[in-house]
Amino acid sequence: MIYQTDNDKLYRYLFKDRAVRGEWVRLNKTFTDTLNSHEYPRIVRNLLGEMMVATNLLTATLKFKGNITIQIQGNGPLKLLLVNGSDSQQIRALARLQDDVYDDMTLSELVGNGILVITIAPTNGERYQGVIALDKPTIAECLEDYFIRSEQLQTQLLIRSGEYEGKPVAAGLLLQIMPDGTGSQEDFEHLATLAATVKDEELFGLTAENLLYRLYHEETVEIYPPSAVEFHCGCSLERSGSALLLISDDEIENILTEHGGSIDMQCECCGTHYFFDKKTIEKLKA
């Protein structure tokens, strides 16, 4: 399969005369790889794409090694949607449904009484967790509010998810006033107004350079080398089997008997099956 140039890449850029920074990311193969083992309804698939883009954009703002997890928790038809991304732009995601969903549902109808939880976990250092009310029409708007409240940084997020030329695609822009205090509200609003004119087909089809020229051809924009984005689950036989180590030997024996001597555990993210017989479990316990 051939993908658009600049897909599965994240670009950072700087407006040199405006003290505003930006990011752009587009996911195609990464998004497809995430969906391959799942048959999510379209509305859930698109929301998952939006969350993946948001996670990539947020991890690119990290000043340290670590990862960010963004999850929706609710009591509506969509019980859980979780995305985890690292500073190296490796990402994984999953969704759990507990009722029927329909493509014309709003975010509120899909999630019910829900919250958005952001967990920032440095490789070295303490974890930070923020909880955001899902009281806006889109995930992007909820996250913009989060940046204003927690970081005191004016931020614009434009995120789209759907299909382009018959393939799943998700893409987005982040625009943020520089945290050093040198940026002005007027400059930010000027650039945000230009960014808001972007069309879905431009986000999904143009290269980063062409997209930024289309939006900001009168600005001086410095584009930095891109970072590759990829789906990476990180599951393993040992990790999947760790849950079995919490079960008593008698219970494991009963489960093995009920399942013909082998326990099948499937990873929720990538769909990989791990099979555990008595010998495999004994090795895990050794």
Curated annotation (Swiss-Prot):
Family matches, as InterPro entries: Heat_shock_Hsp33, Heat_shock_Hsp33_C, Heat_shock_Hsp33_N, Hsp33_helix_hairpin_bin_dom_sf
Cellular component annotations (GO), alphabetically ordered: cytoplasm
Keyword field: Chaperone, Cytoplasm, Disulfide bond, Redox-active center, Stress response, Zinc
Disulfide bonds, paired cysteine numbers: 233-235, 267-270
MF terms in GO: protein folding chaperone; unfolded protein binding
Modification note: Under oxidizing conditions two disulfide bonds are formed involving the reactive cysteines. Under reducing conditions zinc is bound to the reactive cysteines and the protein is inactive.
Compartments, as annotated in UniProt: Cytoplasm
GO BP terms: protein refolding
Similarity field: Belongs to the HSP33 family.
Function: Redox regulated molecular chaperone. Protects both thermally unfolding and oxidatively damaged proteins from irreversible aggregation. Plays an important role in the bacterial defense system toward oxidative stress.
Protein name: 33 kDa chaperonin
Native species: Histophilus somni (strain 129Pt)
Gene name tied to this protein: hslO
